[in-house]
């Protein structure tokens, strides 16, 4: 009887160890940002080895400015995604450090996690002009508001469209007015 209880305790411990989140070591950019006084969270690397870093919305512009000053001069992609119904929305920025002799330029992805109820983040249009239409698309599809953007209007959907079509909890209208093809 005592053997079975000790076995179940050992089983519970091994299950708990398996479920424990792995320790993620901060990459070079996260370490540099931490040394510069920012509070960031290392998210590890993606399947291609690109370092991912979580920052808060109130630090985003300062972090972006620091990265530009460190040579991350190219905004390869800005996008958004929905973590799932009832979960957070994410605005992400994929940055490269381009130079004349770069064979494989350093890359980093910055992510800002936002509440579904009021997804607001500062626009990085004034840091990277390339974020203009990309932020508009994230606004149009997910409802993420980029504060300070010079022209934050819908870019894909009609202006009178209701809702954010790429959110996972979006309920599509029952009727779409279709135009006949000519």
UniProtKB/Swiss-Prot annotation:
Classification via Gene3D superfamilies: NADH:ubiquinone oxidoreductase, 30kDa subunit
GO BP of this protein: photosynthesis, light reaction
Pfam families: Complex1_30kDa
EC number: 7.1.1.-
SUPFAM superfamilies documented for this protein: Nqo5-like
Localization in the cell: Cellular thylakoid membrane
GO molecular function: NADH dehydrogenase (ubiquinone) activity; quinone binding
Gene Ontology cellular component terms for the protein in this record: plasma membrane-derived thylakoid membrane
Enzymatic reactions: a plastoquinone + NADH + (n+1) H(+)(in) = a plastoquinol + NAD(+) + n H(+)(out); a plastoquinone + NADPH + (n+1) H(+)(in) = a plastoquinol + NADP(+) + n H(+)(out)
Broad class of enzyme this protein falls into: translocase
UniProt topology in membrane: Peripheral membrane protein
Keyword terms, alphabetized: Membrane, NAD, NADP, Plastoquinone, Quinone, Thylakoid, Translocase, Transport
Similarity comment: Belongs to the complex I 30 kDa subunit family.
Subunit structure: NDH-1 can be composed of about 15 different subunits; different subcomplexes with different compositions have been identified which probably have different functions.
Function: NDH-1 shuttles electrons from an unknown electron donor, via FMN and iron-sulfur (Fe-S) centers, to quinones in the respiratory and/or the photosynthetic chain. The immediate electron acceptor for the enzyme in this species is believed to be plastoquinone. Couples the redox reaction to proton translocation, and thus conserves the redox energy in a proton gradient. Cyanobacterial NDH-1 also plays a role in inorganic carbon-concentration.
Identification of the protein by name: NAD(P)H-quinone oxidoreductase subunit J
Phylogenetic classification of the source organism: Bacteria, Bacillati, Cyanobacteriota, Cyanophyceae, Acaryochloridales
């Amino acid at each position: 009887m005592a053997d079975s209880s000790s076995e179940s305790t050992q089983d519970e411990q091994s299950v708990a160890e398996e479920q424990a989140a792995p320790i993620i070591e901060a990459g070079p950019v996260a370490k540099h940002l931490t040394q510069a006084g920012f509070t960031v969270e290392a998210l590890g690397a993606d399947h291609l080895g690109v370092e991912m870093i979580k920052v808060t919305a109130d630090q985003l512009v300062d972090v972006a400015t620091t990265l530009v000053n460190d040579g991350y001069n190219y905004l390869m992609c800005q996008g958004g995604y929905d973590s799932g119904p009832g979960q957070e929305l994410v605005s992400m920025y994929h940055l490269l450090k381009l130079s004349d002799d770069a064979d494989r330029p350093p890359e980093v992805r910055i992510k800002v996690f936002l509440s579904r109820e009021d997804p607001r983040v500062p626009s990085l249009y004034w840091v990277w002009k390339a974020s203009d239409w990309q932020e508009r698309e994230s606004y149009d599809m997910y409802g993420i508001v980029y504060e300070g953007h010079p022209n934050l209007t819908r870019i894909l959907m009609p202006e009178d469209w209701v809702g954010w079509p790429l959110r996972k909890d979006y309920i599509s209208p029952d009727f779409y007015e279709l135009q006949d093809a000519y």
